[in-house]
Amino acid sequence: MEANHSEQLSAERQSTPPGDSSSLPSHNGLEKEDGQDSPTPVQPPEKEASVHPDISEELNRQLEDIINTYGSAASTAGKEGSARASEQPENAESPDNEDGDCEETTEEAGREPVASGEPPTVKEPVSNKEQKLEKKILKGLGKEANLLMQNLNKLQTPEEKFDFLFKKYAELLDEHRTEQKKLKLLQKKQVQIQKEKDQLQGEHSRAILARSKLESLCRELQRHNKTLKEEALQRAREEEEKRKEITSHFQSTLTDIQGQIEQQSERNMKLCQENTELAEKLKSIIDQYELREEHLDKIFKHRELQQKLVDAKLEQAQEMMKEAEERHKREKEYLLNQAAEWKLQAKVLKEQETVLQAQLTLYSGRFEEFQSTLTKSNEVFATFKQEMDKTTKKMKKLEKDTATWKARFENCNKALLDMIEEKALRAKEYECFVMKIGRLENLCRALQEERNELHKKIRDAEISEKDDQSQHNSDEEPESNVSVDQEIDAEEVNSVQTAVKNLATAFMIIHHPESTPHQSKETQPEIGSSQESADAALKEPEQPPLIPSRDSESPLPPLTPQAEAEGGSDAEPPSKASNSPAGLGAETQCEGLPVGAQADQASWKPEAEASGQAPQAPTEASLQKMEADVPAPACAAEEHVAAMVPACEPSRQPPRAAAEELPVGASAGPQPRNVADTNLEGVD
């Protein structure tokens, strides 16, 4: 079908004049679209094409007979007529969507053989076709223009649009050039065809002779054309009915569209009303805005006035500030002068402070000599230092403070004298304790020897008694032995308890708040009473034990007359025995002193020996008085108690009563007690 359509276009271009050929190349792009749209309406002519070839064959046969009869000249004319006859059914098959196309093709097919000698009748259908083609081309151009505009709208930048148009123009130029070449070829063909036409016109005269024979053929063709016309009329009627249906449908759609348009018009009216209302609201808002602007202008004016007032106040304040600054400068100068004066005064005070510090160093050098022994004087020194720090701040009161310090210095000297006296007493006490410890060691050794001898004797006696009475009194011996052993144990326990009590009373130290050498006389009757209580304790062996010993179960022998004799011989020198109550009096005096003085007493011994020889006279006098007051039996009782002490040594447990009754001063001077402990351990 496309080939037939292209042949029709070529025939139309041959019929068109050369002046109109320039308008055709630009429409080649739409010819393909027409060729694509053509197959849909071409379906009914295909049935006609199946009928035409039979008639054409019969006509060809008849023409061959005519050509054979009329010779070679007529044969060429017959061939041309057959070619044109073959072109007629092809022209009838061309696709035309319009209603009058089928009728025109049938009329042309019937008129061409009749009016073959009249050329103007042939050009009329060609011109009609050209007009239709031009209309189609214009329609196609509108579609192409729309497509171009759409493609251009898709692009964003003008450069891209320009590139797209340039490409399109290049394509159209190529097509135009190809079509011009085709046009030249067609023009050449047209010249040839015109030459042939001239020849055919010469031969046309010859063809008239064959007209008679061809009339019959024409009649048959007319009959055939009538049938075709009837069919075409039927088709036209059907198409008219279809058109009517389409028009009715189109009218219904138009009515719907009109209804929609009316609805839209109503909506538009509503929108217009809303727009008018909004415009009125906007006007009211604008009026309010103008009123607010006027109000704001008034407010701004009021604020400007306030700002002017504030500026005036600021100027006044600045003037006041300037005056205040001037005053401040004056005060600053005055204060600087005062500061310079105060600095000078401070320098003077610092010089005075250096002088006073020199004096303080002198005093501190004097007091450092006493710091090694007087631990309690550290507190006095601390208070003294605090007062000296205060004196740096209170320079006006230095004279009064110096007077007070002088008085305190005298008091300290008196206290030092007292301490020297106490030191002498303690030295004598120490000697007494050393003597006592030596005696106790000797007694312990003697008692241990006696104990061992007694144990041996008891064992020998038991063995002999067992051997004698083993045969006769086997049942009575255990009872008698048990009774004897119990009596011995009870005696030993009582003797140990009395010895412990005597030791406690012998080492008793009475506490007194004040330590003066005058109180030693007051302590003497107390010591005598304690010695009397010790003697009473010796006479009362039946008292319950106060301090249990670990080795109380072990039998201890009673004291022998030899031990008592030894104790008496050791107690003969009365001067040594008289030192013990003097030592107790000294201990009572030491407890009146602070703890620091007792702790630093050891360091004062060489100094007291070197510098304290002069004040020993009153201490010796007091000792002689104490020796005269204390009776000799007291010393003997103490030695007797000391002789009983070694019985308690195996227990290795110190008496609790003595430990609890010892004062703080006894713990401050631990040297003589340590020596005694080491000696006792050696005895054990």
Curated annotation (Swiss-Prot):
Basic and acidic residues bias: start-end ranges: 45-64, 458-475, 514-524
Region (Disordered): 1-132, 458-485, 514-632, 646-684
Recorded GO CC terms: cytoplasm
Top-level taxon in the UniProt lineage: Eukaryota
Gene behind this protein: TXLNB
Species, as recorded: Homo sapiens
Composition-biased stretches (Polar residues): 1-26, 613-622
Protein known as: Beta-taxilin
Positions in coiled-coil regions: 135-351, 378-467
